[in-house]
């Protein structure tokens, strides 16, 4: 799950399947991390079966999440996530891993240690997602203290 505002990966999961439980795990991680209020989120995805499933749609509804789905066969509708996945494949998953455990460990290190904390994004003024969020909050606090 990608926070479009800061480009931060806020939820992810890794399994040997693409079933609904996979995206449920990622969503629950994102919700635990962000703790949004009801009706404050928009969830955009492609039309994959795991996202369109009744179970997943009910979970989104239970948290008051607004649902948006790409048009069929149009990757440009989900360009930010497609770009993020392309970056992940190029920078982290460009080789075979000796085991799933090693793959999971390397994915965790990449997402949590590199991508969110240190990888610079031109769209964020060459800040990492965490630096961008920190700067945004500092600027917001500064405005409130002046007002």
Question: What are these language model-derived features?
Answer:
Residues 1-147:
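Charged DNA-binding/catalytic regions of mobile-element recombinases
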């Amino acid at each position: 799950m990608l926070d479009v505002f800061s480009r931060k990966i806020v939820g992810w999961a890794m399994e040997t399947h693409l079933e609904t439980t996979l995206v449920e795990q990622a969503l629950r991680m994102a919700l635990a991390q962000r703790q949004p209020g009801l009706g404050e989120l928009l969830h955009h995805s492609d039309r994959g079966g795991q996202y369109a499933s009744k179970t997943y749609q009910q979970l989104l509804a239970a948290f008051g999440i607004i649902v948006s789905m790409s048009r069929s066969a149009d990757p440009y509708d989900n360009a930010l996530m497609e770009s993020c996945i392309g970056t992940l494949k190029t920078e982290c998953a460009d080789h075979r891993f000796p085991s799933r455990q090693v793959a999971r460990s390397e994915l965790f290190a990449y997402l949590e240690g590199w991508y969110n904390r240190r990888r610079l994004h031109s769209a964020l003024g060459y800040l990492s997602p965490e630096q961008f969020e920190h700067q945004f909050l500092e600027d917001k606090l500064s405005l409130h203290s002046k007002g």
